[in-house]
Every structure is written in structure tokens, then in C-alpha cells.
Design a protein with these regions (language model features):
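Active-site acidic/histidine proton-transfer and metal-coordination neighborhood
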Residues: 3, 60, 84-184, 266-274
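Short acidic, glycine/proline-rich loop/turn micro-motifs
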Residues: 78-81, 122-125, 258-261
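Acidic-and-aromatic substrate-binding clefts and catalytic sites of carbohydrate-active enzymes
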Residues: 17-23, 41-54, 118-122, 159-165, ...
Length: 292
């Protein structure tokens, strides 16, 4: 089945605006909706606290679908695939707490490198039981998330962030090993530039489990004008059966930003509104190229 243009859904991550969500930030959600976005990702962590149910009410009133990611303070000892069984147990308990908060937010999905930790990249031969223990814990977490009505979504990241799942092939293999129907995949065009040789093939490989795509350029800037082969990306996305979610992910830079803390040293997103207009405008043109 081929996707139609009106099945593309566009959104953005809170990180375009700020690092930590608070109850003073609902104007950001209003701005995102006014810019035409219908999907928004909010980040949770031990250093984040706000009225989760208020976020749910606000998003529902705007008609915005929410995804949640554990992108703020995530303890290193909370890791579903760690060699230490204590770390794995703490990881399972920690993600369950985040999922409960995500449920209060009314989130449709909980997305990230939740098979491990995006701050742990081990430079050693993988232990034989590393993937099986990751799969086992993902299965347990997916079942817990299912009971809350939330889809559990894993994101392959580059070798500089983690060693376990870098490609769409590995993501599919881990999802299949876990064997739970509530597991999906979130691809990221920034991480893919390091790990994938063929964007189209990578997307097609994950298509049956694809929940969303984090869309940005190879430098984390707005889509368009960089190294990402967008025609190949959209040719593959048009073949996805069901809605295609495209979500801008970058980090606020400039005087009001926090990009330095995330390893972004160029001024790529000083004006979130301009970033969204440029990025979504480009993506919409790619999604709806018109008659040929």
C-alpha cells in the first residue's frame, strides 16, 4: 500500500525551544500548533517536573499527538542491557516510572534508545547474552507500556552514543528477538548519516514497525541543503503502510539556547519558529512534490 500525501504528519521536539519542560511552557505548544504541527515530543527525566495531566488536557484541546522521550536526567545505572543485573533491574523500574508519567501526559508513544543508555558506548566485543537480556527487558517493558496504552519505540543511534543498536537492521532484529507486538522503531536522519549507506533501504527494512522519523540534516540543522538524501527518504516513506510521522529534532542554540550542553557548537537553531517554518516547509515540499 502506498502512503498518500495527507497521511504525513509533522511535528517537533521541545528541544527546539528549551531543554526542560515546565508548567510555564504551554505557549510553546500553542506556537507549534499555530505553525501547523500536530505532533509534539516532550522529554522526561529525574530533573523534570510539571503537571502531566495539564499537558494532556492542553494537547488534547489543540489536537496535538504527544510522544514522550527520556531525554533529560537518565541515570547511567538505569540500563536494560547492562552487564550488571542490578543496573538492568533499576533500568526496568526507572522506565516504568517514566511510562507512568507518560500515561498521565496522554502520550501515544515512549521513544528513545531505551534498550540501553545513550551515554554508554562500550568499545569491547559484545557479551553473548547482551542482546538476549536487552530483548527480554524490552519485552517486559513493552507489555507494561501496552497496559498503559502507550507504544514502546526504540531508536537506533550512532556509534558515538551507544554500541548496541546503530542501524535499522539491528533495530528490527532486536524487536523481533523481543517478540512483542507493542514494539516499534523511531529512525533519525541525523544518526543514519553515520550508520546507514542507503537511507531508502534502511527505511524499507523498518517499515513494518516504523512509528516515526526524527528529521534533521547531517549537522542537526533544519532539513534541506545538507547531506541527507531526502528524495530517497521520501520515496521509501511513501511506501509505508499507515501514517508517516516526521518530527523535527534539534537543540536550541544562540544566547537563549543550550546546544553546547548537547554537543552542538554551531548556531543552528537560534529561532525555533524560523527553524520550524524552514524545516517543515521543506519536508512538506518533499512529501507533496506535485505532478511530474
Amino acid at each position: 500500500m502506498t502512503s498518500k500525501a495527507n497521511e504525513f504528519r509533522f511535528g517537533a521536539h521541545q528541544f527546539l525551544w528549551k531543554s526542560h519542560w515546565t508548567d510555564a511552557d504551554y505557549g510553546i505548544l500553542d506556537q507549534a500548533r499555530a505553525l501547523g504541527l500536530t505532533l509534539f515530543e516532550v522529554s522526561l527525566g529525574d530533573d523534570v517536573a510539571f503537571d502531566y495531566r495539564r499537558l494532556r488536557r492542553h494537547a488534547e484541546a489543540l489536537g496535538v499527538e504527544l510522544s514522550i522521550g527520556p531525554g533529560n536526567d537518565w541515570p547511567m545505572e538505569c540500563d536494560l542491557s547492562h552487564d550488571d543485573p542490578g543496573h538492568r533491574a533499576r533500568g526496568l523500574a526507572w522506565h516504568k516510572r517514566m511510562l507512568e508519567r507518560a500515561a498521565e501526559c496522554g502520550a501515544a508513544a515512549y521513544c528513545g534508545a531505551i534498550y540501553s543508555h545513550p551515554g554508554r558506548a562500550c568499545r569491547r566485543p559484545p557479551p553473548a547474552d547482551e542482546w538476549p537480556r536487552a530483548a527480554e527487558n524490552l519485552g517486559l517493558l513493552a507489555e507494561f507500556a501496552s497496559g498503559l496504552g502507550i507504544r514502546l519505540v526504540i531508536e537506533p543511534v550512532s556509534r558515538f552514543r551507544n554500541h548496541l543498536v546503530n542501524t535499522s537492521r539491528q533495530a528490527m532484529e532486536l524487536v523481533e528477538l523481543a517478540g512483542h507486538p507493542n514494539l516499534s522503531i523511531n529512525l533519525d536522519t541525523y544518526h543514519m548519516i553515520t550508520e546507514e549507506r542507503d537511507y531508502g533501504a534502511a527505511i524499507r527494512r523498518a517499515a513494518a514497525r516504523l512509528w516515526c522519523v526524527h528529521a534533521c540534516e547531517n549537522d542537526r540543522g533544519a532539513p534541506g541543503g545538507g547531506l541527507v538524501p531526502w528524495p530517497a527518504v521520501f520515496a521509501a516513506l511513501r511506501e509505508v503502510d499507515g501514517p508517516v510521522r516526521l518530527l523535527l529534532e534539534a537543540y536550541r542554540t544562540g544566547p537563549e539556547g543550550f546546544g553546547f550542553s548537547r554537543g552542538i557548537f554551531q548556531d543552528l537553531c537560534a529561532d525555533p519558529e524560523a527553524f520550524v517554518k524552514q524545516g517543515i516547509g521543506f519536508l512538506q515540499t518533499q512529501a507533496n512534490p506535485g505532478p511530474r
